[in-house]
Amino acid sequence: MSTEVNANQSPNAESRQEAARSGERDKALNLVLGQIERNFGKGSIMRLGDASRMRVETISTGALTLDLALGGGYPKGRVVEVYGPESSGKTTLTLHAIAEVQRRGGVAAFVDAEHALDPVYAASLGVDVENLLVSQPDTGEMALEIVDQLIRSAAVELVVVDSVAALTPRAEIEGEMGDHVIGSQARLMSQAMRKITGNIGKSGCTVIFLNQLRLKIGVTYGNPETTTGGNALKFYASVRLDIRRIQTLKRGTDEYGIRAKVKVAKNKVAPPFRIAEFDILFGKGISTIGCLLDLAEETNIVARKGAWYSYEGDNIGQGRDNTITWLEQNTEAKEKIEKLVRQKLTEGSEVSSNSMRPLTTANRKAA
């Protein structure tokens, strides 16, 4: 009889013991979390599922196709690297991001290590040049220290560094022409990344580094291209964009812009290896209406038969340029098409062409 009673009571006793252990564990966890926050400050440790940490806010790139490929735009509180050959649209891409930040009331800074920023061109892209913070540092150390202080202020939403290749170490500047200072720039970037990464996460500031391409000597097989400044930036960047000029836009013999293709080479906040294409017009920047037309065609909102584009059964233009002109002149139709495009993209409508496609083995060779 006593054996049956003990057997019946055993599960209850085990559950009480488990509850007691769980209570002690929770108490110990709360004590250590409180101790860590007292020692290192509030927010030094947190649960990943907190609502404030789950969703990564973004800054628009200025190109709807690229926003789609990135999962919304440049992520806030992260490091972004944009690299590519000369005259491919790197600076234009970042100036559009600056204009977007300023339009929303934020503060942006441009660290012009190349000493090549054109304020007239920046203003034509919508940048408020009077309120844009600009620094033209003498050395790489000075540039990165300015970047660090801007980040730690938590008052700046976006910092652009143009470019990593122009961040010349002090030892190289103070030395004589022809002196070999091996690895000095890579060491400088590695130290800077270690120092600023933590502050970027706390302040929510986005830092975009522009970078140039170099060729590895003696590479017979594989891609000989590499970026400057060592490997540190490759590891610390949450997003890496490879931008290339794939076509020159012409009207007759007059060149009026380029067609750019961006490969998302790395993305920690959305699926990587997507591709976006858009037009960059000389003196005007990214063609937002051109991006809209591309996506409207891919989502079957605007149809194309031969050279003619049609919307709701009516022809709106013969050829891409004429259709873009029609959309510029008919703002009501443009806004309606944009609303439909965003609605379809939000619903997960499949976009099948270059503006958003995984870079598979087959199309990687084609790209």
UniProtKB/Swiss-Prot annotation:
Q: Which keywords belong to this entry? A: ATP-binding, Cytoplasm, DNA damage, DNA recombination, DNA repair, DNA-binding, Nucleotide-binding, SOS response
Q: Which HAMAP family match?
A: RecA (MF_00268)
Q: Which SMART domains does the record associate with it? A: AAA
Residue segments, region Disordered = 1-24, 348-367
Q: Where is the composition biased (Polar residues)?
A: 1-14, 349-367
Q: Please give one Pfam family short name.
A: RecA_C
Q: Please name the source species.
A: Prochlorococcus marinus (strain MIT 9211)
Q: Which GO terms describe its cellular component?
A: cytosol
Name of the protein described by the UniProt record: Protein RecA
Record function comment: Can catalyze the hydrolysis of ATP in the presence of single-stranded DNA, the ATP-dependent uptake of single-stranded DNA by duplex DNA, and the ATP-dependent hybridization of homologous single-stranded DNAs. It interacts with LexA causing its activation and leading to its autocatalytic cleavage.
To which protein family does this belong? Belongs to the RecA family.
Task: Please give the chief subcellular localization of this protein.
Answer: cytoplasm
Matching entries from PROSITE patterns are given as: RECA_1 (PS00321), RECA_2 (PS50162), RECA_3 (PS50163)
Taken from the UniProt record, the cysteine pairs bridged by disulfide bonds within this chain are none
